[in-house]
């Protein structure tokens, strides 16, 4: 920071000297005096510069100290902000924990209240059940005395529960026998109803079977007639097929004879197979066409001969 200020003062001194040189040039001052004046001006300027430098150093030190104080305050403020932020975060965390604990306590209190209500209801039900059992016990006291008397009369049983178990077994057996009896009676009634239905439906069934037998007999007779008709048609078809086969054989023999005659007329040996009837017919057809063309040519040549 000192170099720019020194440059500034040096430039200011040069400007000041440059402004005074013309004025001094006008005056006729001896060179020695001018040199002394210049030295004095330089000394004054240097003193002024040193004074300004001292002031500048003082201000710079003060500013530096001020900056350090400001930086220290800034660091302190940042630390305060950090501590305050941490304090706020801790406070918020404590508040959230307190809210969660309060909510959990309310929830637990609600659950405890519900559990207490359930237990109280269960207690009331148990009390009612106890009262009902007490009333039943009072009603069953005569039965208990009666069972004890019966146990004295029955030496085969040592305890009342044995007698009660035996009685329960007999009661269950009796109930099972009664159920089985009802089921058998129901089956018997169903069998009787089915037998009566069969007896009632027997005449109708016999009549229906007779009608069905007559229908089947009619269908059998019709089938026999159709069989005879088809047999006669089959014989007729066989006869017709035999006639067609005989006619086909004769036709094939005639075609073979014609083919052989044509080959003999042409002086050529037969080259086609005996079973190739179509080829033989085609050969005879070509021969007949050639012969017809030849005869037609002869018919046209005979009238032309007398004219010549």
UniProtKB/Swiss-Prot annotation:
GO terms for biological process: cilium movement; inner dynein arm assembly. Residues 34-143, 175-233 form a coiled coil. One of its GO terms (cellular component) is axonemal doublet microtubule. It is found in: Cytoplasm, Cytoskeleton, Cilium axoneme. GO terms for molecular function: dynein complex binding. It holds the Pfam family DUF4200. InterPro entries: CFAP_domain-containing, DUF4200. Belongs to the CFAP73 family. May play a role in ciliary/flagellar motility by regulating the assembly and the activity of axonemal inner dynein arm. This is Cilia- and flagella-associated protein 73.
